[in-house]
Amino acid sequence: MGPVMLDVASYELDAEEREILKHPLVGGLILFSRNFHDAEQLRELVRQIRAASHERLVVAVDQEGGRVQRFRDGFTRLPAAQSFAAINDAATAAQLAQEAGWLMAAEMMAMDIDISFAPVLDIGHVSAAIGERSFHSDPQQARIMAECFIRGMHSAGMKTTGKHFPGHGAVTADSHKETPHDNRPLAEILTHDMVIFRELIQRKLLDAIMPAHVIYTEADARPASGSAYWLQEILRQELGFEGIIFSDDLSMEGAAIMGSYAERGQASLDAGCDMILVCNNRQGAVSVLDNLSPIKADQLTRLYHSGQFDRQTLMASSRWQQANKALTALSERWDAHKQTLGQ
């Protein structure tokens, strides 16, 4: 298994994609909304992906809830992370967050999808890229909600990915469109934004981490996703993280500062990433596959899901039905709440 995660164009594989998935550097595939028409088609696409690759790939998606939910029709409408604590008492918020983690994971694993890149551990709602994807503006409250969501995911059999290390919540720029700079003192980042990562790592609740395409100017001139300081010195050595480190999508403008696609990929691997994401640019992905030196990343097998969910059986279960009803209601209440605030 190799260290590259890429994407495919549509609802089913084409001939070129079948060949690309056999490349020894490919170890994963991420799905997007454009790959989804309905649940039956999605299940068949994942089957095609499994059949095309020589080794079992890690199949991933961003199914967080709120505005980031790639699969909607036929799946539970998942609430935005901010909604749990914002409009519920503490006990209800904790219960709903845990059920959301369980239900999201169960619905994805019923499609034979290994991981959803969740939860978001960024603090606060000012960032254009984050907003309601953050659980809370208070680090301890965010950690409590995230821990509940994680326990739900783990109980279903899905591994967790905390993002975006060491914290994307304070920058207003969107790293999908430009390279954000966080100019705050390093001490503030370490004692405010990074605390949630530190505590969840200590509790052994994070199986993987995705760093931010953000330059923390008081620490390093490179984005965290390509920074040996953040990934090796801080994340591995100081925090003792032993799980998988993903790059964020190297096609994002925030990664362009690291050079060509192949240079971005090599820089991220050299900095300490275990798996690099190259999405939404077939030419860029092929360039990475053509130019990266051969490398094995067998540790990625730890991310395979361990759930045994049949979609029909899951949706007939009382737990799913109760969770589906409660989470759909929370999503609707959150919409109404935002309207009263003029958002």
From Swiss-Prot:
Entry keyword annotation includes Cytoplasm? yes
A Pfam family that this protein carries is: Glyco_hydro_3
Record's GO cellular component terms: cytoplasm
Q: Where is the protein situated, by its record's location annotation? A: Cytoplasm
Residues the UniProt record annotates as site (Important for catalytic activity): D174
Q: Which positions are catalytic residues?
A: H176, D248
User: Its Enzyme Commission number?
Assistant: 3.2.1.52
Q: Does the keyword Cell division apply?
A: yes
A single GO BP annotation from the record?
A: carbohydrate metabolic process
Enumerate the residues binding substrate: D62, R70, R133, K163, H164
Q: What class of enzyme is it?
A: hydrolase
Query: Which pathway does the record list?
Result: Cell wall biogenesis; peptidoglycan recycling
Report the PROSITE patterns cross-referenced here.
GLYCOSYL_HYDROL_F3
What's the chief localization of this chain?
cytoplasm
The reaction(s) catalysed by this protein are: Hydrolysis of terminal non-reducing N-acetyl-D-hexosamine residues in N-acetyl-beta-D-hexosaminides
- Which InterPro entries does the entry link to? Beta_hexosaminidase_bac (IPR022956), Glyco_hydro_3_AS (IPR019800), Glyco_hydro_3_N (IPR001764), Glyco_hydro_3_N_sf (IPR036962), Glycoside_hydrolase_SF (IPR017853), NagZ_Beta-hexosaminidase (IPR050226)
Q: Which UniProt keywords apply?
A: Cell cycle, Cell division, Cell shape, Cell wall biogenesis/degradation, Cytoplasm, Glycosidase, Hydrolase, Peptidoglycan synthesis
Q: Name one GO molecular function term.
A: beta-N-acetylhexosaminidase activity
> What's the family?
Belongs to the glycosyl hydrolase 3 family. NagZ subfamily.
Instruction: List the PANTHER family.
Output: BETA-HEXOSAMINIDASE, BETA-HEXOSAMINIDASE-RELATED
Q: What does this protein do?
A: Plays a role in peptidoglycan recycling by cleaving the terminal beta-1,4-linked N-acetylglucosamine (GlcNAc) from peptide-linked peptidoglycan fragments, giving rise to free GlcNAc, anhydro-N-acetylmuramic acid and anhydro-N-acetylmuramic acid-linked peptides.
Q: Which NCBIfam families match?
A: PRK05337.1
UniProt name for this protein:
Beta-hexosaminidase
Which species is listed as the source?
A: Yersinia pseudotuberculosis serotype IB (strain PB1/+)
Which gene codes for it?
A: nagZ
